[in-house]
């Protein structure tokens, strides 16, 4: 099961247990707030909020590529063919 399904089952179970024991809503909210699952969700939310509000670090400049060594006896490129004139 995914986390959303487990979270829904958790809340429904707490709601049923609270309704059976008493009708006070404050105790139910207190129980939810102190539960381990909600503590984890709060800590993850705080962490995501810190990451979202933190300034982004400036990207480091990419290292310049090393110049390639030219081959010693490179043949001259063939003479470029003359360009043809276009008709107007």
Swiss-Prot record:
Comp. bias (Pro residues): 56-68
Keywords attached to this entry: Cleavage on pair of basic residues, Repeat, Secreted, Signal
Region annotation (Disordered) ranges: 49-88
Tissue specificity statement from the Swiss-Prot or TrEMBL entry: Expressed by the venom gland.
Superkingdom: Eukaryota
Propeptide: 23-45
Gene Ontology CC annotation, any one: extracellular region
Subcellular location: Secreted
Residues in the signal sequence: 1-22
Biased composition (Low complexity): 69-81
PAPE repeat residues: 57-60, 61-64, 65-68
Protein name, entry field: Pape peptide
Organism, as annotated: Tityus serrulatus (Brazilian scorpion)
